[in-house]
Design a protein with these regions (language model features):
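Amphipathic alpha-helical scaffolding segments comprising HEAT/armadillo-like alpha-solenoid repeats
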Residues: 107, 383-389, 412-433, 454-465, ...
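Alpha-solenoid HEAT/ARM repeat scaffold
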Residues: 68, 81, 107, 120, ...
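Alpha-helix N-cap/helix-start positions at coil->helix boundaries
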Residues: 396-397, 439, 455, 469-471, ...
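Conserved hydrophobic register position within alpha-solenoid helical repeats
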Residues: 158, 312, 349, 387, ...
């Protein structure tokens, strides 16, 4: 085997050496350019060799009058000055601004973006230059622009960014003014979007409110944003996301020292989990009780009135009662009996404590609540939508802008992906140089985009979908699943809302989305669609993901969906049961109240263990 690999390596080296010799022999001819391009398709070669080939091709393109293609190659090489000179001839303000930022000439980039009316990009470049005052001015200009064009969402985001800059400049009055404007715009736009049925759009508005609270260090907008996000998730039936947002809200509230909110949110999450049949209700209710005990302790330490301590302890009693924890209920009543309350109350609490201690002593040991899984505990990543959505609104959707911006991004983009981005951009330039229609790209270019494996390919694919006929739309959607990026669901969603070949392509693409990052979107689509083929495709892909979390969702579908969908979930669990699902299955077998389902889960557990033994 080692000898075979060595032979293949020598053959590949020999092939490349011959290809380089051939390209040099062809000289400054179209065939010569094609030969260098063929070499650039070897995206895994050594950086020094690849850079040499790029320089040869760039020089050749300049001689052929292909300035734009040459500029893209120099951008890949991070040759800022040559790229700028070439982009000045044929490029756009976005091209120039992007290269200036690569060269850390952020002040020049700010001016370029500003002259082009790209105020979001200009403000971001000013931030990178450390010029918070200029960034503040630009963000405020963007607020006025978006208000004038009646785009309250982007105006609200611009105001949020202006507040960030004002905070850096210690301009307290300006922070308060811009945050007040931001809150008004995002609240109103969130309401409007909800009434229009755009729950996802409203959700983004409420995420903005969460950030307002973080900047202002005020709990009110922070809580308003989270509670509205949770409410929308409940309306959409996204039980998994609802629990995740509850947990994240609780953790964030705890960090802010909002103990009463922490206790109440635990209780609310527990009641919700019990209502929808999640087995983690007892975990949240127990945590709620413990949080109320902490509130009671702190009230006592601060010397607050006995009535406040009493209220907290009674809230803990209520939560412990919900999980039938008589021992801890008795302990709470003992503490209540020791408070400085009326003799009548103290006697009653003492009697209750005695009675419950007697009952608890006779009772058999109770199982602890099901452990809350680690994947639910993960803190949700902070989505900087207040920056990203502003920049995205100004970005072009053509290939040179959407994919081309990765070419010179050596800090955030893998080297091979930078090379693939360069090749896609050069192929697009070939199409334009040959007189092709920018809105009608050849199918081969669609294939290249789909095989790019980067979220940046989604935006041009969406543009091609919008501009294409039915055949083009279907091709774009079918190939989009190859991206294996969760962002591709923007296309799949649109295809599923269509008809004919396009909708069929959407369902087919859905069946191909089997990677772990796709799980959240698959769950969302399953919950938001009624069509059997869509739910069937989503559920099949969820099962193929095969993680602990996917297993949890399949069990939830099995419990809560009557008829064919429950049968489908059961079949998929039997087909896909694997080691990664074991912890979820064991947890659910222990807590499952339905005997038949408990036996089914037990059989899956035993089968996985047998497979594990056979593998050893």
């Amino acid at each position: 085997l080692r000898k075979s690999r060595r032979t293949l390596h020598h053959a590949r080296v020999s092939y490349i050496a011959e290809a380089v010799q051939r390209a040099r022999h062809l000289g400054a001819t179209p065939d010569g350019a094609a030969a260098w391009r063929e070499l650039l398709a070897q995206t895994h070669v050594d950086e020094a060799d690849y850079s040499d080939w790029c320089r040869e091709l760039a020089a050749l393109y300049v001689r052929q009058g292909r300035q734009l293609a040459a500029a893209r190659i120099h951008e890949y090489l991070l040759n800022v000055d040559p790229a700028l000179e070439l982009y000045k001839a044929k490029g756009t303000a976005r091209d120039l601004g992007r290269v200036l930022r690569i060269g850390r000439r952020t002040r020049e980039a700010t001016l370029r973006y500003k002259d082009a009316g790209l105020f979001g990009h200009a403000a971001r470049a000013a931030e990178e230059a450390g010029d918070s005052q200029d960034a503040l001015t630009l963000y405020e200009q963007l607020v006025r622009q978006k208000e004038a064009t009646r785009d309250p969402y982007l105006a609200g985001l611009a105001a949020l960014n202006a507040a960030r800059m004002a905070q850096k400049l210690n301009q307290g009055d300006r922070v308060r003014t811009t945050l007040a404007l931001c809150m008004r715009l995002l609240e109103e736009e969130g309401d409007r979007r909800e009434q229009a049925g755009d729950k996802d759009g409203a959700f983004r508005c409420y995420l903005g409110l969460v950030q307002v609270g973080r900047i202002d260090k005020s709990y009110e907008p922070f809580a308003e944003g989270y509670l509205n996000c949770i409410r929308i998730l409940k309306q959409k039936g996204d039980r998994f996301f609802t629990i995740q947002y509850y947990y994240d809200f609780i953790a964030a509230s705890d960090e802010l020292g909002e103990l009463h909110s922490v206790a109440e949110l635990h209780r609310e999450a527990g009641e919700y989990a019990r209502r929808v049949g999640f087995i983690y209700a007892d975990y949240f209710l127990t945590e709620a009780a413990e949080a109320w005990l902490k509130v009671a302790r702190m009230a006592t330490e601060k010397g607050q009135s006995p009535e406040l301590v009493e209220n907290a302890l009674l809230a803990a009693v209520s939560c412990f009662n919900r999980v039938q924890d008589d021992k801890n209920v008795a302990h709470c009543y003992t503490q209540l009996a020791g408070l400085d309350l009326s003799d009548k109350k103290k006697a009653r609490y003492s009697d209750l404590a005695t009675d419950l201690e007697r009952l608890a002593a006779k009772a058999t040991g109770r199982d602890p609540p099901a452990a809350f899984p680690e994947y639910f505990r993960r803190r949700l990543p902070v989505q900087e939508i207040w920056v990203r959505d502003l920049l995205e609104a100004e970005n072009g959707s053509d290939i040179p802008d959407a994919v081309g911006r990765l070419i010179g991004d050596h800090k955030n983009v893998w080297e091979v992906q930078r090379r693939k981005a360069l090749l896609i951009s050069l192929t697009y330039d070939d199409h334009i140089a040959a007189g092709g229609d920018p809105e009608r790209v050849p199918p081969a270019l669609i294939e290249s985009l789909a095989g790019f494996q980067h979220a940046a390919a989604v935006r041009p694919l969406v543009a091609m979908y919008d501009q294409g006929d039915e055949a083009t739309k279907a091709l774009v959607v079918e190939r989009s699943a190859q991206l294996k990026q969760k962002e591709v669901f923007a296309l799949i969603d649109r295809a599923l809302s269509s008809s004919g070949r396009v909708r069929e392509a959407g369902v087919a693409a859905l069946r191909g989305m089997k990677s772990q990052p796709a799980l959240d979107s698959l769950v969302r689509i399953f919950n938001s669609h009624e069509a059997h083929d869509v739910r069937d495709a989503a559920l099949g892909s969820i099962a193929a993901v095969g993680t602990d979390e996917a297993c949890e969702f399949l069990l939830d579908v099995l419990r809560s969906n009557p008829g064919n969908m429950a049968i489908k979930a059961r079949t998929l669990l039997e087909q896909h049961a694997q080691e990664r699902m074991l912890s979820s299955l064991e947890r659910n077998r222990k807590q499952e109240p339905d005997q038949a389902l408990r036996l089914f889960i037990g059989r899956l557990v035993e089968r996985i263990r047998l497979q594990r033994g056979a593998a050893l």
